[in-house]
Amino acid sequence: MDRRVLFASLILFAGGAAGVGVALFAFVGVDDGATEAEIVWESDPVTGDDGSGAVVATMDGDPLVLQSVAANGTRSVRATAVGGGVEWTSPVGTGAGGGAAPADGDGGEAVEAAETSGLVTGTLGGEQVVALTTRSGSLVVFDADDGSERFVVDTGGRSAVRPAIGDVDGDGDAEVVAVSTSGGVLAVDAGGDPVFQSDVGAPIERRPLAIDFSGNKASGDDVTNGVAVVTADGDEHAVRLLDGDGDVRWTATPSVTPLSWRQADSQNGPILALGGTNGNLETLEVADGSTRYEIGLQDLPVAVGDAGPGRVYVGGSGSVWAVSLLDGEVSWKQQFGGDTRVNAPSLGVLGGGDEADPVAINREGDLLVLNRNGGVTARGSVGAVVYASPQFADVTGDGTDELIVVTEDGTAVAVDVSD
């Protein structure tokens, strides 16, 4: 396809009380000069992981793909060295202190066929960990280095909702946050001891966000730590921000029904970006829950991805959008893959550069690497269905990151997009 750029003016108009904007946009065409992506490694497929809950952790420079897997009726977390084999497998324990087994050996006591959430990684007490919750109501945390069980705590209700890791009380140390589907919110420290446990009085259906904007001074508000949750009571949805003691700081009723959401920083203070089932993007001020803007992206639905300097990147139906965090102005739209749904875009530093570039992959496994102006710098395909966002790690040892994609059958794929 010849490179083409079609420019159109941005049109904003009042659309109800919230002032919904609808945009025409700068459309950036696919560039024939783009690098063709190359698959440099694939793992074996695994049972019990469709890729949506897998994460990547780098230990001493070596990347591990961490997945929740099922084998012989037992749910486990498995770590696979990128470019190598299985490093450890740890059964999802019941708190009996079960440890990891190298490769596919047996570990400690396990929950039979436990239904679990997606995984999350972060640093607790100076060590890299991986955490999940179970449907039966446990928060389970492992050391990412060797798979040893760090702690298991009761969430206070049924869960299997992905937890979050961040400094929610502003003390300089990260906590783990888990929710129960009945409305419980639990934050624990690096040892598994409670920081707070609250109940917001309504079902929680989305993963919590660990709000940590301690270094932000733009908002003029010194309370930029806490936990954000989305609750649903029938057709009514609400966003609540809890402070570091578990008290509700504010409650907001967004115009959109949130399908995905992220936190992001901006020159005017931190915000929560909500992708609605109606195709609208709505942002709420972390300071007080007020709506900064709502804009229709002409896609249904939209998946909110990573945010970079001044922008948030959103996946739609065959589209990637770059939207200003300040006012909702659409900077550009890139189309690919027809009407195939695009997963939430990620930001990563690739090819030895010093700026993070947006990367998107759609449900058919087609991927694009874009620059800040929406131009395509690399493209390719992993040849399989993908439900998750791309992740990043240095696979080849050349000092630059490659893409890590996990497909619907649990196969981890490393993709080189360098020139």
Annotated model-derived regions:
Residues 1-419:
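Hydrophobic alpha-helical segments
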